[in-house]
């Protein structure tokens, strides 16, 4: 990245900004004493798996770096000037925007993302409905798209199982933002051509919320590119933020979260203390048909299931173990990247008060966390499309876990195929109602009638 490009982008190149004097180091801690001493400095762990004997990357300010030196822990500086690194990343985004790439070949700011999602909804109104989940701490909308095919005989939209896909609980994880938006858009774009997509959209209602933390996401488009939490301030007005993915009520306050507001995993003053988690909680409580969920993060190449708060296995562990293999296999088939899989606690780290544990433990929803590809939280724009395409395949398999058999012949949805259903279909057929178009050829004709007779005689599966 040349100096001229940085200057043209209007970016700080002389060390100005919140990360001036900050570095990223790689170290390996070999004892619990060393790990506790390092953790006591309240650093920002950039490696998602800070385990003994394994290399980890840590973001340190100048004072923390001096403290690490005094501790005598060996380390290697991998980024000597984090502010310059952040500026260079911003310049890459600016340069990509100046080119002629597609929407998903670059990161998009909140306004661009919202305009794109609105365009997806406007372009397919029969299939896509905008959804307002709620409002953030600073009053921004938490919005999403509900994607489901129009009503079909024996399979109306209001009876279909639901799946919830969300991204960007952590503000700096922009790849998750783009991948979830891509998933929503391409459920629509691939509906006609891809039979697996068509089957999922026909048999489920899929709600995609690309940005759960809109305040934090907007904040990362300013000077603090690596901000993680929401925008909660303390009583004196100092910004400290709450880690939304430690603010959920199931086993809130336990291992893998912090009561220190300066910590990156600060859990808040109470479970559901934050309007962002409250809004998602209330949406889920209002939608009892939710059967599958995925919370998308970066980075680490992982497919993870409950639990986060304990090493004990959940009651449905055999189901999750099998599903994790299917999901990881679908991801691997796209670009060849193999994702680790398993429970959160043992695959990544202990984490209590997380979304996935609440969705599964409190609501019985089959729930996953993805940690996508990429080098840290700010991979270059060239990593976006590979992440989007492989994540699409994995998320589609998450949705497919929610699907149930459909009995088209059961027109009144009472679980029994009888003469009443035949009369209902006959009325629809005579009226030329689109629900009677069983072969999807945009015409109600005798072929549809014969198809219904065959389904009627076969009964429900």
Predicted segments, located by residue:
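Alpha-helical segments with a strong preference for the paired helices of cellulosomal dockerin domains
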Residues: 411-433, 440-461
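Positively charged n-region of N-terminal signal peptides that target proteins for export
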Residues: 1-4
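M14 metallocarboxypeptidase catalytic domain recognition
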Residues: 6-407
């Amino acid at each position: 990245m040349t100096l001229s490009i940085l200057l043209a982008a209007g970016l700080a190149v002389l060390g100005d900004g919140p990360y001036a004097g900050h570095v990223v180091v790689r170290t390996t801690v070999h004892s619990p004493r060393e790990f506790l001493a390092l953790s006591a400095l309240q650093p920002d762990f950039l490696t998602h798996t800070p385990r003994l004997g394994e290399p980890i990357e840590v973001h340190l300010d100048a004072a923390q770096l001096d403290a690490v030196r005094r501790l005598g822990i060996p380390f290697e500086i991998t980024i000597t000037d984090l502010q310059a690194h952040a500026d260079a990343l911003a310049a890459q985004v600016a340069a990509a925007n100046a080119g002629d790439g597609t929407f998903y070949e670059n990161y998009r700011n909140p306004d661009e993302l919202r305009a794109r999602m609105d365009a997806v909804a406007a372009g397919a109104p029969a299939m896509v409905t905008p959804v307002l989940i709620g409002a953030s701490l600073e009053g921004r909308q938490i919005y999403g798209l509900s994607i489901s095919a129009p009503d079909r005989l024996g399979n109306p939209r209001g009876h279909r199982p639901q799946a919830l896909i969300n991204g960007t609980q952590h503000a700096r994880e922009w790849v998750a933002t783009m991948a979830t938006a891509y998933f929503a858009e391409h459920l629509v774009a691939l509906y006609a051509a891809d039979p697996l997509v068509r089957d999922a959209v026909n048999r489920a209602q899929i709600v995609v919320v690309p940005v759960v933390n809109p305040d934090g996401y907007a904040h990362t488009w300013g000077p603090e590119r690596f901000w993680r939490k929401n925008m909660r301030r303390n009583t004196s007005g100092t910004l400290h933020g709450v880690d939304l993915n430690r603010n959920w009520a199931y086993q809130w306050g336990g291992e893998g979260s912090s009561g220190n507001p300066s910590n990156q995993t600060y859990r808040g003053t109470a479970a559901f203390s934050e309007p962002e988690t409250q809004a998602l909680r209330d949406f889920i409580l209002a939608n009892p048909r939710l059967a599958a969920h995925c919370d998308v993060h970066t980075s680490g190449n992982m497919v993870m299931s409950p639990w986060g708060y304990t090493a004990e296995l959940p009651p449905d562990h055999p189901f999750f173990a099998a599903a994790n293999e299917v999901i990881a296999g679908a991801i691997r088939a796209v670009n060849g990247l193999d994702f680790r899989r398993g429970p959160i606690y043992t695959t990544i780290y202990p984490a209590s008060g997380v979304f996935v544990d609440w969705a599964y433990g409190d609501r019985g929803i089959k729930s996953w966390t993805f940690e996508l590809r990429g080098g840290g939280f700010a991979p270059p724009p060239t990593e976006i499309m590979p992440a989007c395409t492989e994540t699409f395949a994995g998320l589609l398999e998450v949705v497919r876990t929610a699907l149930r058999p459909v009995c088209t012949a059961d027109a009144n949805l009472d679980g029994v195929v009888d003469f009443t259903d035949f009369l209902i279909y006959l009325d629809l057929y005579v009226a030329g109602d689109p629900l009677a178009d069983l072969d999807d050829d945009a015409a109600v004709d005798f072929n549809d009638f014969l198809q219904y007779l065959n389904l009627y005689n076969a009964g429900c599966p």
